[in-house]
Design a protein with these regions (language model features):
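Short, flexible loop/turn elements at secondary-structure junctions
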Residues: 27-32, 77, 113-116, 147-149, ...
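Solvent-exposed beta-strand/loop surfaces of large extracellular or lumenal domains
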Residues: 532-545
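N-terminal structural segment of carbohydrate-active enzymes
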Residues: 1-140, 148-150, 155-159, 226, ...
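Conserved, mostly hydrophobic/aromatic
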Residues: 26, 63, 73, 109, ...
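C-terminal beta-strand-rich structural cap/linker in extracellular carbohydrate-active enzymes
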Residues: 22, 542-561
């Protein structure tokens, strides 16, 4: 191994796919809602909602042109809501989170939300039509699989009658056959507290007897910080009928054309079950992909190599590193950076992953995290462009963006249950202004603000390049930071540089996280020329720096061949 090879990655084991997936997460409830007259903490009849039909041909063509390959439809599976209109049956408001409810408090795994349909009685047909439109546009569809928990009233609204644990459509109903006199039995779907009523942190008369364990805590008395709107599913670490019931859930949606599942909070679910599930589903649907929401980096290898996930969130790795680097620079100005705010963390994280890197799902936004343009993060969407160059272009791993990110959505509305926290609420009926403008712009019915349009053009250029270029989708990576620590103008804590190469194409990418423009010399060592098999020339060699100008909080790409 030659010196510097630890800064290069060439061979990946168990690579799931050759192309680089680019995933667009979208909440249909918000996407198609063009209502401007919004009232905080108000219902669907006042604030409105988007529908399946709003994921139309124009929207999907826009996503395809943007460079997207997969659309993650969030909040599709039927969940608890306080709504009694548009075909919805309300759950108890004492535990429903927000008027619209949480998309992760599932009331029926085999149904979609009636409010997303023009005709609630035909909601499954409208969902199927959306999936067909997605495929017709050359895109793949992802939905959530929530294996850890369900809503407190799961099964209450399943098609009746329920006989022998199955509803009128033949689908299994979790908990229907449980023995509620026992705290735990291997054949029970839930955990019970015999003789103890549920004590909610909210005031009211809601009665659950016996209490069931909540999604994140084994207790009949969840706190306000717990997932008190949910009930924990009992899997055991060995095969049970519950495993089969959940297998039916995934196969039901895969048979309707769903191409992938983003699996929620899998660290709370036995790995024995998840491994069995993935293997079993892929026997029936070999092309279906599984993405895990995982936060413990020490478990990454297990979830890929043993459990069989195609991709994992790299929230605790690259996302956290870029978050701290951005906030350290944007919010602290020219103040000295702490080590955890240094761009060196990008290299450290990358080296720690090794051959797991192509299985990481890189992102800068999702429904759980604060918006880049929020006052709590980078303040403006353009201030995150330096991070975009790294997260999107540094390796072959997939990349995800959250709807409105490309237009600089700030997430600074006070919708209702979700206050002004820098996030776009998933609990309320709402319509973010920048998302409305983006929707109208796509359909030729309105325009974006100048700053939004400029940011969108940058995203289009970067995403379309990444999705259409073999050097990004398949190329090797060489980190140049170790050999530029003392290069003129290069700040190891604020700048990041790397090379991508595939075939005859070689590009240099440089990011500047600082708040001032930077002119720098980038040295390419002889080890890089040798390892990348690039012949040195009079104009490009190990002794002659590449002179680069990088605007503040931005990045550049330079074609070296």
């Amino acid at each position: 191994m030659s010196f510097g090879s630890e800064y290069a990655v060439e061979i990946y084991v168990n690579r799931p796919f050759m192309d680089k997936p680019i995933i667009y997460q979208i909440l249909p409830r918000l996407w198609g809602n063009l209502n401007e007259k919004l009232v905080r903490n108000c219902g669907v009849d006042v604030n409105g909602t988007g529908r399946f039909k709003d994921i139309d041909k124009s929207t999907l063509e826009y996503l395809k042109h943007l460079g997207v390959s997969h659309v993650w439809y969030t909040g599709v599976i039927r969940h608890a809501t306080d709504c009694d209109k548009r075909g919805c049956v309300p759950s108890n408001p004492q535990w429903v989170k927000g008027d619209a409810g949480s998309p992760y408090s599932i009331t029926d795994y085999f149904d979609v939300n009636p409010y997303l349909a023009v005709n609630p009685e035909k909601r499954m047909d409208e969902f199927d039509a959306m999936i067909k439109r997605t495929h017709a546009a050359g895109l793949k569809a992802i939905i959530d699989f929530v294996p850890n928990h369900v809503a407190r009233d799961y099964g209450k609204y399943s098609p009746k009658p329920v006989r022998k644990g199955r509803d009128a459509n033949g689908h299994p109903v979790l908990g229907a056959l449980d023995d509620k006199t026992k705290h735990w039995l291997p054949d029970n779907d839930f955990f019970y507290y015999p003789g103890q009523p549920l004590k909610l942190p909210t005031k009211g008369t809601y009665r659950e007897m016996p209490a069931k364990a909540s999604g994140n805590i084994y207790s009949p008395e969840p706190s306000v910080n717990d997932w008190y709107d949910t009930v924990k599913i009992n899997y055991c670490d060995f095969y049970t009928d519950t495993w089969e019931r959940m297998y039916e859930v995934v196969c039901f949606w895969a048979s309707r054309g769903v191409d992938g599942f983003r699996c929620d909070m899998v660290e709370l679910v036995p790995t024995e079950f998840m491994g069995w599930l993935i293997k079993s589903v892929k026997k029936e649907f070999p092309d279906v992909q599984f993405i895990a929401e995982v936060y413990q980096k020490n478990l990454y290898g297990k979830y890929v190599r043993e459990v069989g996930f195609d991709y994992l969130y790299d929230k605790s790795g690259l996302y956290d590193a870029l978050h701290d680097i951005m906030t350290g620079n944007v919010n602290n100005g020219n103040a000295p950076l702490e080590q955890w705010q240094s761009a060196r963390r990008i290299t450290w994280n990358w080296q720690s992953l090794g051959d797991l890197q192509p299985h990481m799902l890189n992102f800068l936004e999702n429904h759980d995290e604060q918006r880049l343009a929020s006052d709590f993060f980078a303040r403006k969407g353009r201030n995150a462009l330096a991070a975009m160059y790294v997260s999107l272009l540094f390796n072959t791993a997939p990349f995800m963006l959250y709807f409105g990110q490309e237009a600089g959505e700030k997430g600074m509305d006070e919708e209702g249950m979700s206050g002004k926290d820098g996030r776009t609420s998933i609990f309320d009926w709402w319509s973010p202004a920048s998302v409305r403008r983006l929707n109208l712009f796509i359909h030729g019915k309105g325009d974006l603000e100048p700053e939004e349009k400029a940011l969108l053009e940058r995203y289009k250029a970067l995403l379309s390049f990444a999705s259409g270029s073999d050097v990004i989708k398949k190329g090797v990576t060489y980190d140049l930071c170790y050999c530029n620590m003392y290069s003129a103008g290069f700040n190891i804590d604020k700048n990041f540089a790397f090379i991508r190469k595939y075939g005859e194409e070689t590009i240099l990418v440089v990011s500047n996280f600082g708040i001032q423009d930077s002119d720098m010399d980038i040295m390419i060592p002889s080890e890089a020329f040798e390892w990348l098999q690039i012949p040195q020339s009079e104009s490009m060699n190990a002794s002659t720096p590449v002179k680069v100008h990088v605007p503040a909080c931005d990045g550049v790409m330079i074609n070296l061949r």
